[in-house]
Amino acid sequence: MSAVLSTENGLILKLYIQPKASRDQIVGLHGDELKVAITAPPVDGQANTHLVKFIAKQFRVAKSQVIIEKGELGRHKQIKVINPQQIPPEVTILLE
């Protein structure tokens, strides 16, 4: 499976998370996953909350449309984005 998979109602993203980064950004490919750097620390779910907020902003969807399907407690996550209004260029390249 590639880092980004298109489904009938959205996208499934396989992510590698880098917490406590200097800024929030989609870095690029990391093996067969998309690397995302976020500023939040991996403490008490702060990184997950921040990640959902960041992904929702990047894809212009509500936070409720970003679902962590796998990897709640680790760096390797699978996230579903339901009906994205916009797709960031870093992700568009992987869809082609």
UniProtKB/Swiss-Prot annotation:
Coiled coil: none annotated. Gene3D superfamilies: YggU-like (3.30.1200.10). Pfam families: DUF167. GO terms for cellular component: cytoplasm. SUPFAM superfamilies: YggU-like. Belongs to the UPF0235 family. PANTHER family: UPF0235 PROTEIN C15ORF40. This is UPF0235 protein YPO0944/y3330/YP_3498. It comes from Yersinia pestis.
